[in-house]
Design a protein with these regions (language model features):
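Sec-dependent signal peptide recognition
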Residues: 2-7
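Hydrophobic h-region of N-terminal signal peptides that target proteins for export
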Residues: 10-18
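Alpha/beta-hydrolase-fold serine-hydrolase catalytic core, especially in secreted/extracellular enzymes
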Residues: 20-117, 122-128, 240, 310-395
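Structural recognition of the beta-strand scaffold that forms the well-ordered cores
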Residues: 132-135, 152-157, 221-223, 243-248, ...
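Cap/lid segment of the alpha/beta-hydrolase catalytic domain
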Residues: 135-218, 251-260
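Extended catalytic-interface subdomain
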Residues: 193-204, 223-225, 247, 284-319, ...
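Primarily recognizes the serine-hydrolase "nucleophile elbow" in alpha/beta-hydrolase
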Residues: 200-265, 294
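Mobile cap/lid helix-loop segments that gate and shape the active-site cleft of serine hydrolases
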Residues: 247-305, 326-334, 342-347
Length: 395
């Protein structure tokens, strides 16, 4: 009798989880489902409470329907304290066209126009409309992962919005193309600007439709490595039309928790913490307000940036050979973020693979299976298992 009851309970649990997952969207057709929610109160930095552990990403959330508001609150906090405002754009401000295989998007704000261009490389297999993987400045993932799959690829050229790069010439803060459109947001960090630019490309794809672009806008992924891995994560977190985010070796300011990196710095490690990151990417006030032990006053941490991707799919790729990348801080952040997906019965939509013994941004073949599984399931809709992708080696 006991065995029968246990079997029935197990079946009921599995059925409930399956039903819950089937009702949870894989992607949305709007950039921000939380646009109707007002921003929460934003205290001055020195009035924020000290939070030693990673903040609770699910604070106040009991069911999935409550996640939209919590996700919106997290997004507002990240913009206010971390990267600056990502401004909304009305459909009539965007005009898109195809020039051969190049998507061209003109965005008008006031009297200013910013033009984005992205060449689309169509696959040699399959039929349109195709899934699309967009690389933030480039796709660092090996080409063979896409060559035999019906997935188009494109590049978001970040310099068209903000041309900052760590090496070489670039404009100063307040002098970028984005700043022509939004002079009041000249203090923004690059990641808010780049996320804005990615969203405008997706606006263009939606506006033209699959008949013109040959792209299935329900199956768009973004990926990048290093600084561009952070970029991919911010783009995916702040645009719910992106079905899959693959953040490759994103380092500090990406998936690695600021709090954990601060503690590792105190322990003698040399990594990208909130004091040593590149402040062209973030609000300069973030360093002023949250340097050193003040990081514990930050009302969020990077696990919540990751969690903003939920209920969509996220794969984090690490490389512990490079201490600077702070994978020891990314792992607890990833574990904390995954609890959000798990709460809603969709834990198999988020995973990580942290493996060393290879160059920076050079994914080894040993990590191909994890990437292939996420691409196949979330871009191509194939029946592939992605549960329990929590691989950690050499850390």
């Amino acid at each position: 009798m006991k065995k029968t009851v246990m079997a029935m309970l197990t079946l009921l649990a599995l059925t409930t989880a399956s039903a819950q997952e089937s009702k949870t969207p894989l992607v949305y057709d709007v950039e921000n489902t939380g646009s109707k929610f007002a921003a929460p109160t934003m205290p001055a930095a020195d009035q924020l409470p000290v939070i030693r552990e990673l903040p609770d990403a699910l604070e106040g959330v009991k069911k999935f329907k409550g996640w939209a508001k919590r996700r919106s609150d997290i997004g507002h906090m990240i913009q206010h304290y971390g990267i600056g405002t990502k401004p909304a754009v009305k459909p009539e401000q965007v005009k898109a066209r195809m020039d051969g295989d190049t998507l061209v998007v003109d965005v008008t704000v006031g009297q200013e126009v910013l033009t984005l261009k992205s060449h689309i490389r169509y696959p040699k297999t399959g039929q349109a409309p195709y899934a699309l993987m967009i690389g933030t400045d480039m796709i660092a993932l090996p080409r063979q992962l896409f060559e035999d799959r019906p997935i188009a690829t494109a590049t978001f050229v970040s310099a068209q919005v903000n041309d900052y790069k760590q090496f070489g010439k670039h404009h100063d803060r307040g002098e970028h193309n984005f700043d022509r459109l939004y002079p009041d947001l000249k203090d923004n960090g690059a990641y808010s600007m780049w996320a804005w630019g990615m969203s405008r490309l997706i606006d263009g794809l939606q506006q033209l439709g699959p008949e013109v672009t040959k792209i299935d806008t329900k199956h768009i992924g973004v990926t990048g490595c290093s600084y561009a891995g952070k970029m991919a994560l911010y783009c995916g977190a702040f645009d719910e039309r992106i079905a899959l985010v693959i953040a490759q070796e994103p380092g500090g300011g990406g998936a690695a928790a600021w709090r954990k990196s601060h503690e590792s710095t105190l322990a003698g490690k040399n990594l990208e913490d909130i004091d040593k990151t590149d402040y062209h990417w973030f609000l300069e006030s973030q360093k002023e307000n949250f340097r050193g032990d003040s990081v514990y006053r930050l009302p969020y941490d990077q696990h919540e940036l990751c969690a903003m991707v939920c209920p969509r799919a996220l794969l984090l790729l690490g490389n512990p050979d490079y201490e600077w990348l702070a994978d020891g801080s990314m792992l607890p952040s990833a574990e904390a973020a995954k609890k959000v997906w798990e709460r809603f019965g969709i834990g198999d939509r988020m995973g990580w693979s942290i493996v060393g013994k290879h160059g920076h941004c050079r994914l080894p073949e040993t990590q191909f299976p994890e990437v292939q599984a996420f691409i196949d399931r979330f871009l191509l809709g194939r029946d592939v298992k992605t549960d329990n992708i929590k691989r950690v080696e050499d850390l």
